[in-house]
């Protein structure tokens, strides 16, 4: 699967608008290539450079398989609790230095098995 954002390219800096120092709104995302036997999608955004190894910024499950995008600040599926202890999106807010934020979209079949995956990496430093 191909996961992209019109707001930033892969391995590029995420605009401050989508971070804790900006408006803290989720960036727009779009994807293609969802496998035919997909029943739901899930999306996870993790800071892989966090002091504890990773920090979850967004956890979305039960996204309908026919969905091909999430608009800026949009809500689809069921949003879980992020690492800040709040439901929904929590923008990048690294304590120091540049951090990588991995957006991972998974396609799941009717048994919850992963049948496809797409990743997009953003970078940010305060």
What is each model feature region?
Residues 1-126:
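N-terminus-centered regions that define maturation/targeting leaders and the start
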């Amino acid at each position: 699967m191909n996961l992209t954002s019109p707001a930033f390219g892969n391995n590029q800096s995420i605009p401050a608008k989508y971070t804790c120092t900006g408006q803290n709104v989720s960036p727009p995302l779009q994807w293609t290539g969802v496998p035919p036997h997909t029943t739901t999608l899930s999306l996870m955004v993790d800071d892989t450079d966090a002091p504890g190894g990773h920090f979850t910024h967004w956890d979305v499950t039960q996204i309908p398989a026919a969905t091909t995008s999430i608009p800026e600040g949009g809500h689809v599926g069921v949003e879980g609790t992020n690492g800040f202890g709040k439901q929904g999106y929590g923008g990048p807010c690294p304590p120091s230095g540049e951090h990588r934020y991995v957006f991972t979209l998974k396609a799941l079949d009717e048994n919850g098995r992963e049948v496809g995956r797409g990743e997009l990496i953003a970078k940010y430093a305060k």
